[in-house]
Amino acid sequence: MATADPFDSALDLLRRLNPKHTAEHLNNLITLAPDLTEDLLSSVDQPLTVKRCKQTGRDYLLCDYNRDGDSYRSPWSNQFDPPLEGGNQGGSGGDGEGDGGEGGAAGSIMPGERVRKMEIKANEAFDVYRELYYEGGVSSVYFWNLDDGFAGVVLLKKSSPTNPSSSGVWDSIHVFEASERGRTSNYRLTSTVILSLATKGNALGEVDLSGNMTRQVEQDLPVENDESHIANIGRLVEDMELKMRNLLQEVYFGKAKDVVGDLRSVGSLSEGQRDRDAQMEIIGSMRKA
Protein backbone atom coordinates (compact mmCIF):
# COMPACT_ATOMS: atom_id res chain seq x y z
CA MET A 1 0.00 0.00 0.00
CA ALA A 2 1.43 3.37 -1.04
CA THR A 3 2.26 5.83 1.72
CA ALA A 4 0.11 8.98 1.67
CA ASP A 5 1.91 12.25 1.04
CA PRO A 6 2.11 14.18 4.35
CA PHE A 7 1.34 17.52 2.68
CA ASP A 8 -1.77 16.18 0.91
CA SER A 9 -2.89 14.53 4.15
CA ALA A 10 -2.50 17.80 6.04
CA LEU A 11 -4.58 19.68 3.45
CA ASP A 12 -7.23 16.95 3.52
CA LEU A 13 -7.42 17.17 7.31
CA LEU A 14 -7.79 20.96 7.25
CA ARG A 15 -10.69 20.66 4.80
CA ARG A 16 -12.56 18.52 7.34
CA LEU A 17 -12.08 20.83 10.33
CA ASN A 18 -13.99 23.96 11.32
CA PRO A 19 -12.63 26.78 9.09
CA LYS A 20 -13.28 29.22 11.92
CA HIS A 21 -10.23 27.78 13.70
CA THR A 22 -7.97 27.32 10.66
CA ALA A 23 -5.11 29.32 12.21
CA GLU A 24 -5.12 27.14 15.33
CA HIS A 25 -5.30 23.91 13.33
CA LEU A 26 -2.51 25.13 11.05
CA ASN A 27 -0.23 25.88 14.00
CA ASN A 28 -0.89 22.41 15.42
CA LEU A 29 0.01 20.78 12.10
CA ILE A 30 3.19 22.85 11.81
CA THR A 31 4.17 21.76 15.32
CA LEU A 32 3.67 18.12 14.35
CA ALA A 33 5.40 18.45 10.96
CA PRO A 34 7.85 21.41 10.96
CA ASP A 35 9.20 20.46 7.51
CA LEU A 36 5.78 21.34 6.02
CA THR A 37 5.78 24.87 7.46
CA GLU A 38 6.52 26.86 4.29
CA ASP A 39 4.31 24.70 2.05
CA LEU A 40 1.34 24.95 4.41
CA LEU A 41 1.68 28.68 5.04
CA SER A 42 1.84 29.41 1.31
CA SER A 43 -1.05 27.08 0.40
CA VAL A 44 -3.65 27.50 3.14
CA ASP A 45 -5.81 30.60 3.31
CA GLN A 46 -6.43 31.60 6.91
CA PRO A 47 -8.27 34.50 8.58
CA LEU A 48 -6.34 37.74 8.22
CA THR A 49 -4.56 39.34 11.17
CA VAL A 50 -4.38 43.09 11.76
CA LYS A 51 -1.16 44.87 12.74
CA ARG A 52 -0.35 48.56 13.20
CA CYS A 53 2.45 50.22 11.25
CA LYS A 54 4.87 51.82 13.71
CA GLN A 55 6.01 54.43 11.19
CA THR A 56 2.57 55.66 10.04
CA GLY A 57 0.21 54.51 12.78
CA ARG A 58 -2.08 52.87 10.19
CA ASP A 59 -3.42 49.33 10.38
CA TYR A 60 -2.44 46.74 7.77
CA LEU A 61 -3.17 43.07 7.17
CA LEU A 62 -0.76 40.17 7.47
CA CYS A 63 -0.47 37.30 5.02
CA ASP A 64 2.18 35.08 3.47
CA TYR A 65 2.74 37.58 0.65
CA ASN A 66 4.13 40.32 2.92
CA ARG A 67 5.95 37.92 5.24
CA ASP A 68 9.66 37.31 5.51
CA GLY A 69 10.36 34.81 8.27
CA ASP A 70 8.69 36.33 11.32
CA SER A 71 8.65 39.86 9.86
CA TYR A 72 5.85 41.54 7.91
CA ARG A 73 6.06 44.45 5.48
CA SER A 74 3.72 47.40 5.91
CA PRO A 75 2.24 48.69 2.61
CA TRP A 76 2.13 52.20 4.05
CA SER A 77 5.81 52.57 5.00
CA ASN A 78 7.36 49.68 3.02
CA GLN A 79 9.18 48.71 6.23
CA PHE A 80 9.39 45.26 7.84
CA ASP A 81 8.38 44.75 11.46
CA PRO A 82 10.37 43.48 13.24
CA PRO A 83 13.33 44.73 11.15
CA LEU A 84 15.03 42.16 8.95
CA GLU A 85 18.48 40.90 9.78
CA GLY A 86 21.14 42.70 7.75
CA GLY A 87 19.19 45.96 7.70
CA ASN A 88 17.46 45.35 4.33
CA GLN A 89 14.36 47.36 5.16
CA GLY A 90 13.36 48.87 1.84
CA GLY A 91 11.74 52.28 2.27
CA SER A 92 8.84 54.39 1.16
CA GLY A 93 10.42 55.34 -2.13
CA GLY A 94 13.41 53.04 -2.73
CA ASP A 95 13.58 50.43 -5.42
CA GLY A 96 14.35 47.69 -2.89
CA GLU A 97 14.79 44.83 -5.31
CA GLY A 98 17.09 42.85 -3.06
CA ASP A 99 16.13 39.51 -1.60
CA GLY A 100 14.71 39.87 1.88
CA GLY A 101 16.13 36.59 3.13
CA GLU A 102 14.39 33.35 3.95
CA GLY A 103 10.67 33.26 4.61
CA GLY A 104 7.42 34.01 2.83
CA ALA A 105 6.69 33.12 -0.74
CA ALA A 106 6.61 36.18 -2.98
CA GLY A 107 6.60 38.53 0.00
CA SER A 108 10.30 37.90 0.64
CA ILE A 109 11.23 40.08 -2.39
CA MET A 110 10.75 43.83 -2.22
CA PRO A 111 8.86 45.32 -5.19
CA GLY A 112 10.86 47.29 -7.75
CA GLU A 113 10.47 51.07 -7.97
CA ARG A 114 7.78 51.01 -10.68
CA VAL A 115 5.80 48.23 -9.01
CA ARG A 116 6.11 49.91 -5.61
CA LYS A 117 4.60 53.11 -7.06
CA MET A 118 1.66 51.08 -8.38
CA GLU A 119 1.36 49.40 -4.99
CA ILE A 120 1.04 52.79 -3.28
CA LYS A 121 -1.70 53.88 -5.71
CA ALA A 122 -3.50 50.56 -5.32
CA ASN A 123 -3.54 50.91 -1.54
CA GLU A 124 -5.02 54.39 -1.86
CA ALA A 125 -7.67 53.15 -4.31
CA PHE A 126 -8.73 50.14 -2.25
CA ASP A 127 -8.77 52.24 0.90
CA VAL A 128 -11.57 54.24 -0.75
CA TYR A 129 -13.22 51.03 -2.01
CA ARG A 130 -13.16 49.58 1.52
CA GLU A 131 -14.80 52.66 3.00
CA LEU A 132 -17.53 52.73 0.33
CA TYR A 133 -18.38 49.02 0.30
CA TYR A 134 -17.52 47.91 3.82
CA GLU A 135 -18.01 51.16 5.77
CA GLY A 136 -15.00 50.33 7.90
CA GLY A 137 -12.59 47.45 8.27
CA VAL A 138 -8.99 47.22 7.05
CA SER A 139 -7.50 46.83 3.56
CA SER A 140 -3.98 46.13 2.31
CA VAL A 141 -2.47 45.61 -1.14
CA TYR A 142 0.92 44.04 -1.86
CA PHE A 143 2.67 43.86 -5.26
CA TRP A 144 5.79 42.03 -6.39
CA ASN A 145 7.73 41.69 -9.65
CA LEU A 146 7.43 38.89 -12.21
CA ASP A 147 9.57 38.25 -15.29
CA ASP A 148 6.79 39.26 -17.70
CA GLY A 149 4.82 41.64 -15.50
CA PHE A 150 3.86 41.73 -11.85
CA ALA A 151 1.60 40.06 -9.32
CA GLY A 152 -0.14 41.07 -6.14
CA VAL A 153 -2.73 40.40 -3.49
CA VAL A 154 -5.65 42.54 -2.34
CA LEU A 155 -6.76 41.92 1.25
CA LEU A 156 -9.98 43.12 2.89
CA LYS A 157 -11.21 42.45 6.41
CA LYS A 158 -14.38 43.55 8.19
CA SER A 159 -15.44 42.49 11.69
CA SER A 160 -18.79 43.23 13.26
CA PRO A 161 -18.83 45.33 16.45
CA THR A 162 -18.03 43.35 19.58
CA ASN A 163 -21.24 41.85 20.90
CA PRO A 164 -21.56 39.07 23.51
CA SER A 165 -24.51 37.52 21.66
CA SER A 166 -23.28 37.67 18.05
CA SER A 167 -20.14 38.04 15.96
CA GLY A 168 -19.21 38.13 12.32
CA VAL A 169 -15.95 38.34 10.35
CA TRP A 170 -15.43 38.69 6.58
CA ASP A 171 -11.98 38.12 5.06
CA SER A 172 -11.42 38.34 1.32
CA ILE A 173 -8.11 37.46 -0.36
CA HIS A 174 -7.64 38.29 -4.04
CA VAL A 175 -4.39 37.01 -5.58
CA PHE A 176 -3.64 38.05 -9.16
CA GLU A 177 -0.98 37.87 -11.87
CA ALA A 178 -0.70 40.50 -14.59
CA SER A 179 1.18 39.43 -17.74
CA GLU A 180 1.91 42.48 -19.88
CA ARG A 181 1.53 42.06 -23.65
CA GLY A 182 2.02 45.42 -25.31
CA ARG A 183 -1.21 47.42 -25.17
CA THR A 184 -3.09 44.65 -23.33
CA SER A 185 -2.52 42.69 -20.16
CA ASN A 186 -3.68 39.24 -19.15
CA TYR A 187 -5.03 39.08 -15.59
CA ARG A 188 -5.52 35.85 -13.67
CA LEU A 189 -7.41 36.34 -10.43
CA THR A 190 -8.00 33.81 -7.64
CA SER A 191 -10.36 35.06 -4.94
CA THR A 192 -11.12 33.48 -1.58
CA VAL A 193 -13.71 34.60 0.94
CA ILE A 194 -13.50 33.36 4.53
CA LEU A 195 -16.70 34.04 6.45
CA SER A 196 -17.60 33.37 10.07
CA LEU A 197 -20.98 34.17 11.63
CA ALA A 198 -22.06 33.20 15.14
CA THR A 199 -25.00 34.04 17.36
CA LYS A 200 -26.43 32.72 20.60
CA GLY A 201 -29.44 33.47 22.73
CA ASN A 202 -31.94 31.88 25.09
CA ALA A 203 -34.67 31.72 22.46
CA LEU A 204 -32.75 30.26 19.51
CA GLY A 205 -29.73 28.67 21.17
CA GLU A 206 -26.33 28.78 19.47
CA VAL A 207 -25.68 29.01 15.73
CA ASP A 208 -22.25 28.99 14.06
CA LEU A 209 -21.86 29.32 10.28
CA SER A 210 -18.28 29.28 9.03
CA GLY A 211 -16.72 28.46 5.70
CA ASN A 212 -14.68 29.61 2.75
CA MET A 213 -15.22 29.81 -0.98
CA THR A 214 -12.73 30.21 -3.84
CA ARG A 215 -13.38 31.35 -7.40
CA GLN A 216 -11.08 32.10 -10.36
CA VAL A 217 -11.30 34.31 -13.44
CA GLU A 218 -8.97 35.17 -16.33
CA GLN A 219 -9.39 38.18 -18.59
CA ASP A 220 -7.48 40.28 -21.13
CA LEU A 221 -7.92 44.04 -20.69
CA PRO A 222 -6.47 47.09 -22.49
CA VAL A 223 -3.66 48.99 -20.78
CA GLU A 224 -2.51 52.53 -21.56
CA ASN A 225 -0.32 53.19 -18.52
CA ASP A 226 0.31 51.96 -14.99
CA GLU A 227 -2.85 53.63 -13.71
CA SER A 228 -4.81 51.44 -16.12
CA HIS A 229 -3.55 48.41 -14.20
CA ILE A 230 -5.00 49.80 -10.97
CA ALA A 231 -8.37 50.43 -12.62
CA ASN A 232 -8.42 46.97 -14.22
CA ILE A 233 -7.52 45.19 -10.99
CA GLY A 234 -10.10 47.21 -9.09
CA ARG A 235 -12.81 46.32 -11.60
CA LEU A 236 -11.95 42.60 -11.48
CA VAL A 237 -11.96 42.53 -7.67
CA GLU A 238 -15.20 44.50 -7.46
CA ASP A 239 -16.99 42.19 -9.92
CA MET A 240 -15.69 39.06 -8.19
CA GLU A 241 -16.74 40.23 -4.73
CA LEU A 242 -20.23 41.05 -6.01
CA LYS A 243 -20.61 37.58 -7.53
CA MET A 244 -19.33 35.86 -4.40
CA ARG A 245 -21.61 37.89 -2.13
CA ASN A 246 -24.61 36.94 -4.24
CA LEU A 247 -23.59 33.27 -4.18
CA LEU A 248 -23.22 33.33 -0.41
CA GLN A 249 -26.55 35.05 0.12
CA GLU A 250 -28.70 33.20 -2.40
CA VAL A 251 -27.15 29.74 -2.48
CA TYR A 252 -25.25 29.02 0.72
CA PHE A 253 -27.28 30.99 3.26
CA GLY A 254 -30.52 30.24 1.43
CA LYS A 255 -29.81 26.50 1.59
CA ALA A 256 -28.74 26.71 5.23
CA LYS A 257 -31.99 28.51 6.06
CA ASP A 258 -34.04 25.79 4.35
CA VAL A 259 -32.18 23.02 6.18
CA VAL A 260 -32.56 24.71 9.58
CA GLY A 261 -36.24 25.36 8.86
CA ASP A 262 -36.80 21.66 8.13
CA LEU A 263 -34.91 20.49 11.21
CA ARG A 264 -36.03 23.01 13.77
CA SER A 265 -39.37 24.58 14.65
CA VAL A 266 -39.50 28.09 16.07
CA GLY A 267 -42.75 27.29 17.92
CA SER A 268 -42.96 24.95 20.92
CA LEU A 269 -43.32 21.19 20.45
CA SER A 270 -46.69 21.16 22.24
CA GLU A 271 -48.09 23.77 19.86
CA GLY A 272 -46.85 21.79 16.90
CA GLN A 273 -48.43 18.60 18.25
CA ARG A 274 -51.77 20.37 18.77
CA ASP A 275 -51.68 21.62 15.19
CA ARG A 276 -50.98 18.12 13.89
CA ASP A 277 -53.77 16.63 16.02
CA ALA A 278 -56.23 19.23 14.73
CA GLN A 279 -55.14 18.53 11.17
CA MET A 280 -55.64 14.78 11.61
CA GLU A 281 -59.07 15.38 13.16
CA ILE A 282 -60.17 17.48 10.16
CA ILE A 283 -58.89 14.85 7.73
CA GLY A 284 -60.75 12.13 9.67
CA SER A 285 -63.99 14.11 9.59
CA MET A 286 -63.69 14.63 5.85
CA ARG A 287 -63.22 10.88 5.28
CA LYS A 288 -66.32 10.03 7.35
CA ALA A 289 -68.37 12.53 5.37
From Swiss-Prot:
Highest taxon above the source species: Eukaryota
SUPFAM superfamilies cross-referenced by the UniProt entry: Subunits of heterodimeric actin filament capping protein Capz
Region named Disordered: 73-110
Pfam families: F_actin_cap_B
GO cellular component, one term: mating projection tip
Main localization (coarse): cytoplasm
Record keywords, A-Z: Actin capping, Actin-binding, Cytoplasm, Cytoskeleton
Gly residues compositional bias, start-end: 87-106
Subcellular location: Cytoplasm, Cytoskeleton, Actin patch; Cytoplasm, Cytoskeleton
GO molecular function, one term: actin filament binding
GO biological process, one term: filamentous growth
Entry function: F-actin-capping proteins bind in a Ca(2+)-independent manner to the fast growing ends of actin filaments (barbed end) thereby blocking the exchange of subunits at these ends. Unlike other capping proteins (such as gelsolin and severin), these proteins do not sever actin filaments.
Annotated family: Belongs to the F-actin-capping protein beta subunit family.
Subunit structure: Component of the F-actin capping complex, composed of a heterodimer of an alpha and a beta subunit.
UniProt-recorded name of the protein: F-actin-capping protein subunit beta
Species name: Neurospora crassa (strain ATCC 24698 / 74-OR23-1A / CBS 708.71 / DSM 1257 / FGSC 987)
Gene name per UniProt: fac-2
